[in-house]
């Protein structure tokens, strides 16, 4: 399909203008429209559907015993990730850095990874979206399930996985382009080229990242001309422009001042209403402030995992208690 036809089909499904009245479309009609799109546009359109229409479509799919091709997601899966006996090596298996990890990560929660430097928490984070696969000499054993599907199966490509799992790094990494183009970059790569649709995506993403009011009159300004805190929120907006299921954050506030850090933390608490968020942090105070669940890593092992209040107030593991109290680091 050409771009003009693609955009017309998407507008049939997504309520992007007043001419579209989704209330008049039944589940079968929506399903039929989905089949006209490529897989990336299908995923985008699905994520923009109102909850009521999603529910109707699920009912229809259950009756037909089939699913829209959206990574074959289990719609009722309680955990966003399930890790089973996972091991990871660098340097052609000469450096064993993650050992027999088993962990369930819940949906729509903030999960904090804590532990001393070099304990494996960032390495593990980058295995969730297969970024470590880009490093020569790495290998792994065990399984990582994303919404019930093994991420190493042929059902999910690395590209599809990274579309559904956004990433925000320690240092803000805006592209050398305008604010608008930074946020529109992912949707464009996934086949969304209509200017009006992109404008709506950019506005919504910047609003979700609490940045719109600060930059709405300067969207042509270079992204790297923003302040450090604004750049990090721009990177968050860019990550959520594709409506991912998960946001991975690798020490997202470590390079920011206290005021910018507070804004990011406030934003995370708002974003968890829609996304599952996993954050690596060296700040135990930050983990206590914003996370629902905490995982303590030590020398490549998971020492303890559970509700944040329990981990910090009544840890079961002596090593966890020693780390939290500052006896080890």
UniProtKB/Swiss-Prot annotation:
Q: Where in the cell is it found?
A: Cell membrane
Species this protein is from = Ureaplasma parvum serovar 3 (strain ATCC 700970)
Q: Which Pfam families match?
A: ABC_tran
Q: Could you tell me which CDD domains the record lists for this protein?
A: ABC_PstB_phosphate_transporter (cd03260)
Fill in the subunit field for this protein: The complex is composed of two ATP-binding proteins (PstB), two transmembrane proteins (PstC and PstA) and a solute-binding protein (PstS).
Q: Where do the annotations place ATP binding?
A: 115-122
Name the record gives this protein: Phosphate import ATP-binding protein PstB
* Function according to Swiss-Prot or TrEMBL: Part of the ABC transporter complex PstSACB involved in phosphate import. Responsible for energy coupling to the transport system.
Stretches of the chain forming a coiled coil according to its record: none
Membrane topology of this protein: Peripheral membrane protein
Q: Which UniProt keywords apply?
A: ATP-binding, Cell membrane, Membrane, Nucleotide-binding, Phosphate transport, Translocase, Transport
MF terms from GO for this chain are: ATP binding; ATP hydrolysis activity; ATPase-coupled phosphate ion transmembrane transporter activity
The encoding gene is: pstB
Residue ranges of every copy of the ABC transporter domain listed in the record = 83-324
- Domain of life from the UniProt record: Bacteria
Entry's InterPro entries?
Answer: AAA+_ATPase, ABC_transporter-like_ATP-bd, ABC_transporter-like_CS, P-loop_NTPase, PstB-like
GO terms under cellular component: plasma membrane
Record's catalysed reaction(s)? phosphate(out) + ATP + H2O = ADP + 2 phosphate(in) + H(+)
Q: Which GO terms describe its biological process?
A: phosphate ion transmembrane transport
